[in-house]
């Protein structure tokens, strides 16, 4: 998979479809990689130049020493567009990717035709809760948070 350098991170990305068509970039949620968008990639690549990337610290992208900021994640997207010589794109982000999309819409609107934010908020959780969750994963792996993650994403009848 191709990578490029954005500030201090190696960002993994992949493109699908014809680069002469309108660009559409997908941004993953916390704890996932760009493959979460596979159904959308398959559908949209006929009509769009689809760009997917792993947010820094996720998937095959590097995880330089943090902390990370939404400003930094947004700039990674702009740097990716620059790397691919894409002037303007549509953007779709979910959860953490949606936070990135909000930053892009506010700070770099000239680079985006549309910004779609899914399952996100202006602020998600408190800093200490995220720090505690990260420490738990570092110490014990993903298993301790797996069941609580499923309950946040799906209703009881679905699980």
Region annotations inferred by a language model:
Residues 7-66:
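Conserved HGGG/HGGXW glycine-rich cap/lid loop of the alpha/beta-hydrolase fold
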Residues 2-6:
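Short acidic-hydrophobic surface loop/beta-edge motif
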Residues 46-47, 87, 140:
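Structured helix-beta-strand junction loops
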Residues 54, 118-119, 152:
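Alpha/beta-hydrolase-fold catalytic nucleophile elbow
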Residues 39-42, 46, 79, 106-110, ...:
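Short, well-ordered alpha-helices that flank and scaffold nucleotide-derived cofactor binding pockets
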Residues 83-126:
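Conserved hydrolase catalytic core segment
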Residues 71-89:
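Conserved acidic catalytic loop of the alpha/beta-hydrolase fold
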Residues 125-129, 139-159:
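Conserved alpha/beta-hydrolase catalytic His-Asp/Glu region
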